Amino acid sequence: MCMIDFEIMDFVQPVAGVHAFSTTRGQVDGGNPYSEVNLCYTVGDDALHVLDSRITLARQLRFDLDDLIIPGQKHSSSVAVIDEDYRSLDIESQDAALDGVGALVTQLSGIVIGINTGDGVPIVLVDGQAGIIAVAHAGWRGTAGRIIKNVVEKMCRLGARTNDIQAAMGPSICQDCFEVGDEIVDAFAQAHFDLNVIVKRNASTGQAHIDLRAANRDELLAAGVPASNITTSQHCSSCEHDRFFSARHLGINSGRTFTGIYKLY
C-alpha cells in the first residue's frame, strides 16, 4: 500500500502541535467496496487488509501501531477518556474499555484517537488552552443520543472551557442524500431537535431528508461552543463515494472513512 491521502480538517484558529484529518479511499480497485484504505475491522473486510491499512497510517504519521486508539464502529453516544490508566491495560482490557464507545477524549500527546464512519458526521474537537482533544462519530443514532453534549461535558470535566473549544466536522452524507423513514424523524422529535431546521421533505416523493450537519452544529451551539469556532466540511460521502466510503451508496459491507486527531506535545 502506498501513501494514504488525507482530507485535512482545519480548525478556525490553528492549534500548535494539533493535527486532524480524514482518510480518503485512495486508488479505488474497480468494484471492491473496501478499496483502497480501510481501518475498520467490523465491516466484513479481510483482517489483513485492515491491519495493513493501520500499519501504513501509523508509519506515515510516525507513530507506533499501538498508538492508534480506535473503537469498533458503534452507533452510540457513550464517551471514553483515554488516559494513562487506559494505556496501562492489556490489549483485551483496552478493547473491552472501548466496547460500545462512540467518542474519545484525551489529554495525552503522542497518540492518535480516531473513529470510523460510513456516512455519519466525524467531529474533532480541541481546547488548545487546556490541551484536550476529542473525536466523535455522530451518525443519526449518536446525534439523536446527544453524543456531542456528552463529549463537551467530558472535556469540561477534564478542564476545558466551552468558549475555548473548537470543532470541525468532516466528510459526511449531505441532506439531499440522507433520505430516512419517519421512524428516524420521530427519534429526533422525541429528542427535542428542531425539525424545522434539520428535516425537509422531497416534494416529489414525500420522503424525509435529515441534515446531520445542521443537527450537530445546533448541538455544539447548545453545548456552549461559539458559532465562530465551528467549521463544516461540504464533502458528501455519498456524492463522492469514489473518494470517501459511503455505506448508503456502497452497502453496509464496505470500507469506512477514518477520522483522527492527535497532538504532538
Where would I find each of the regions flagged by the language model?
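Active-site microenvironment for binding and transforming phosphate-containing groups
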Residues: 1-265
